[in-house]
Amino acid sequence: MPPPAVAVAGGTGNLGSKIVKQLLTSSSLPRFRELIVLARAESDKTREFQSQGASVRIYSEDNLPKALDGVDVLINTVGSTGHHFKEAMLRALPQTSVKLYFPSEFGVDHYVHDFPHEEWDAKKKHYRLAQELIPGIRISRVYAGLFLEDSIGPWFGFNTKHSRYEAIGSPDQVTSYTSMDDVGRALGVLLTLDPAKVPEQVHLAGDSKSVAEIAQIMDEASGEKNGIEVTSASLAEYKAEVFANPRPTPEKYLRFLMAEGLIDHTAKGLGNDNALVEGADGFGRWKTLQDLARETGGKPWGDAEWP
C-alpha cells in the first residue's frame, strides 16, 4: 500500500496543532507522502508548519471537496463550536478520495454513558450521520480518556494550590490519561495501517492511576512534608446534584464518570488498544503522570483556582 496523503482539519487548534507537530517528526514523515494542514486562515502557526514540511490548504464550507482533493486519511480535530462545519465536511466526503476517517472524538468514550449531554450528543449524531453518508469509508473513533496536560487541576478535584485532592467516590478508582502529543504519535501509526484493519474504536491510555496514586506521585516529586490531603465525596449525592443542575460544559460530568470507572482504559475497564501502536518505529514510550510530576515539581496547575 503506498504511503497515504493525510489531512488534519482544525490543524492549528489546541489538539490539532499537537497532532500536526507529532506527525511532522522525522519518525513519522516516511509514513505518508504528504501532510496537509486544513485551516480557516493563514497564521504564524500555518507558516511554521509549512516551514517544517507540511502543506497548508485554506478551507471553508464552500470549497471542502477541493480542499480534500487527493486526501487518503482525514483526521478531524475541529472543536466543540464547529459542529455545523463538521457536518458540512462530512457531507463533502463522498466526493473525495478519503479512505480512512478519524472523527473529532479523542476524549472519553461517551457511547457508554446512560445520560444526555449536548456536547457528546452532537458527537453521537455526527457518527450516526457518518455511517449513513460514507459507508465505504473506514471510520475509527479514538478515545484517549482525559488529556494528561490539562486534567490534574481543580476542575477535576486536584486542587494543587490548596494541597487537597477530592475524589468522587473511591479515591482508589483508576482513570486513564493520555498526553495530546501521544495522541498524535498514536495516530501516526494508525493512519499507516490498511484502513480495513484499523479498529472502529481505539481506547488509548498513556497512564492509568487513581486519585490516591496521583497524590503520592506528586508528593514524591514536590518533596513537601505535609503532602496532599486526599478526601472523597459521595458519588450518589454528587451525581444527583449534577443532574439537578445541568451544565453545558463537561467537567462535573467527567468527575462522576471517573468515579464510575467509565474513563478506565485498562483491560479491567473499557479495554486497552495501546498494543496497536506500541513497538512501531519511532513511537517510543507513553508520557506518564510521573513525567508530569517531574516537569511541574509535583504541582501541575499549581496556581489555578476553580469555582
Task: Describe the function of each predicted region.
Residues 227-237:
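A generic structural motif
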Residues 77, 104, 145:
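Conserved residues at the C-terminal ends of beta-strands
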Residues 235-307:
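A hydrophobic C-terminal alpha-helical subdomain
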Residues 30, 69, 96, 137, ...:
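Structured loop/turn residues at beta-strand edges in well-structured enzyme cores
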Residues 2-33, 38-45, 84, 109-227, ...:
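Oxidoreductase cofactor-interface core, primarily capturing Rossmann-like NAD(P)-dependent enzymes
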Residues 5, 72-73, 100:
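Structural motif
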Residues 37-96, 108-114:
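NAD(P)H-binding glycine-rich loop region in Rossmannoid oxidoreductase-like domains
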Residues 99-105:
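Short beta-strand elements of ligand-binding domains
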